[in-house]
From Swiss-Prot:
Residues 13-204 form the Glutamine amidotransferase type-1 domain. Residues 205-400 form the GMPS ATP-PPase domain. GO terms for cellular component: cytosol. GO terms for molecular function: ATP binding; GMP synthase activity. Catalyzes the synthesis of GMP from XMP. The active site is at residues 90, 178, 180. ATP binds at residues 232-238. Gene3D superfamilies: 3.30.300.10, 3.40.50.880, HUPs (3.40.50.620). This is GMP synthase [glutamine-hydrolyzing].
């Protein structure tokens, strides 16, 4: 399997050095919201490699470690002497202080949650135009009691004497708190002050830039050869296909594989909506029996993902041969809608542990015969939607709630069978109908409906005892799928969904609500 689409070089890139922070991806998103491009690199990356990427600025994230712990992440002092503007947050702030000769105390001066910050120099680079007293979000045990030489202390709390410092001459800045979270009321403003004033960057990274850069990168990669793109019915594959079509036009053929794992009515919707919006050449392959046969007897979620990924590629290879027989030239490239969170969750890009194999990243066989084109690989979901709108795709496609490539296959906890798929389709359709009727489509990120196929519970319907399956509702709110909270849906909507499912769907006698945030749980059950 060949490498993905080469990322076009951004003129100004902010590198977020990840020290194991819960919010590292959120920091990268906040930088992009300020219209400056950002990427994440692991703290294990040597300083010379970080600097070799020619960053316009560097942000040091928070992290769970103490600077005093044996084996805690460190940074070579040369990073701070390279002339690149650096902004330390939480652990990154403490690491900067300690490395440059300041004092960090392991004194038990803990602050967790909302804290009042007193700004001691309102005209400073970071805090100009913000209130002298402001709420910030803290999460630390150690505390900085003395700033390094040459730094000006610009903020403190009742517990921490040095909660922010700045060195304009060396362009080094730091805060003890988390400006990236919404609980820090002026956090985005402080971050933008670092980017625009401290680092001298301009807010010129836009969806138009993304389209222009990716179109050029795709043309350079594909040349005059041909590509196919698998349409799943989702936002990601649709936007990826639209981008590639803009780049290479009729050299692209889209293939929709009906693997039998889609929700009710979705196959017809894909054929109608996407073709109408783009005019792209679309080939539909009915492979439902093949997928069900391959999944027979399989309950392990990782194995299911691998099988679905493998069969998907095999179907694509067959489609390639058919397209070649019909149109001639060889198809050399496969377009995928891989996003940045997919890469991160699969352990790529940040040195993190593999949470689960993503169907767009780790679920592909090693002997794949295509070279991958992944034009969305560095984007978050909200950015993908903006690119889709810029490309002129309709809201029916761009605003569609996320749905995994493996489809209902990973929303059945247990073996996947036709009967179980039919049952889950009906339950899912009811939930979607009621959420739409209540006007909640845009208020939630997505609402997976899950069948616990290997679980049964006792119930009573009419005068008889039942022994049916439970259905799980998993409504979540999120900005980018990296973190999520369960959505507080109105009780009357939940009641209507539950009543309809238990009355209208055979062999289901219980509906339960998943109230787990991410972390610790992932959005999908499998």
């Amino acid at each position: 399997m060949s490498s993905a689409t080469p990322a076009a070089a951004a003129p100004d890139t902010v590198l977020v050095v990840d020290f194991g922070a819960q919010y590292a991806q959120l920091i990268a998103r906040r930088v992009r919201e300020a219209r400056v491009y950002s990427e994440i690199v692991p703290s294990s990356m040597p300083v010379e490699e970080i600097l070799a990427k020619n960053p316009a600025a560097i942000i040091l994230s928070g992290g769970p470690s103490s600077v005093y712990e044996a084996g805690a992440p460190t940074l070579d002092r040369s990073l701070f002497e390279a002339g690149v503007p650096v902004f330390g947050m939480c652990y990154g702030f403490q690491l900067m202080a300690q490395t440059l000769g300041g004092t960090v105390d392991n004194s038990g001066a803990r602050e967790y949650g909302r804290t009042e910050l007193a700004v001691s120099k309102p005209s400073s680079t970071l805090f100009e135009g913000t209130p002298a007293e402001q709420s910030v979000w803290m999460s630390h045990g150690d505390a900085c009691s003395a700033a390094p030489e040459g730094f000006t202390v610009t903020g403190s709390t009742d517990v921490v004497p040095v909660a922010a410092f700045e060195n304009d001459e060396k362009k080094l800045y730091g805060v003890q708190y988390h400006p990236e979270v919404m609980h820090s009321t002026h956090g985005q403003q402080v971050l933008e002050h670092f980017l625009y004033r401290g680092a001298g960057l301009s807010p010129d990274w836009t969806t138009g830039n993304v389209i222009e850069e990716q179109v050029a990168a795709i043309r350079a990669q594909v040349g005059d050869r041909r590509a196919i793109c698998g349409l799943s019915g989702g936002v990601d594959s649709a936007v990826a296909a639209a981008l590639v079509q803009k780049a290479i036009g009729s050299q692209l053929t889209c293939v929709y594989v009906d693997h039998g794992l889609m929700r009710k009515g979705e196959t017809e919707q894909v054929e109608k909506d996407f073709v109408a919006a783009t005019g792209v050449q679309l080939k539909v392959v009915d492979a439902s029996e093949r997928f069900l046969g391959a999944l027979a007897g399989v309950s392990d979620p990782e194995q299911k993902r691998k099988i679905i990924g493998r069969e998907f590629i095999r179907v694509f290879e067959q489609a390639q041969l058919e397209i070649m027989r019909e149109d001639g030239p060889e198809v050399a490239f496969l377009v995928q809608g891989t996003l940045y969170p997919d890469v991160v969750e699969s352990g790529g890009g940040t040195g993190t542990a593999n949470i689960k194999s993503h169907h767009n990243v780790g679920g592909l066989p090693d002997d794949i015969e295509f070279e991958l084109v992944e034009p969305l690989r560095q984007l978050f979901k909200d950015e993908v939607r903006m690119v889709g709108q810029e490309l002129g795709l309709p809201d029916e496609i761009v605003q569609r709630q996320p749905f995994p490539g493996p489809g209902l296959g990973i929303r059945i906890v247990g073996e996947v069978t036709k009967e179980r798929l039919d049952l889950l389709r009906e339950a899912d359709a009811i939930a979607r109908e009621e959420l739409t009727a209540a006007g909640l489509d845009r208020d939630i990120w997505q609402c997976p409906v899950v069948l616990l196929a290997d679980v049964r519970s006792v119930g009573v319907q009419g005068d008889g005892r039942t022994y049916g399956h439970p259905i799980v509702l998993r409504p979540v709110s999120s900005e980018d799928a990296m973190t999520a909270d369960w959505s507080r849906l109105p009780y009357e909507v939940l009641s209507k969904i539950s009543t309809r499912i238990t009355n209208e769907v055979t062999d289901v006698n219980r509906v339960v609500l998943d109230v787990t945030s991410k972390p610790p749980g992932t959005i999908e059950w499998e």
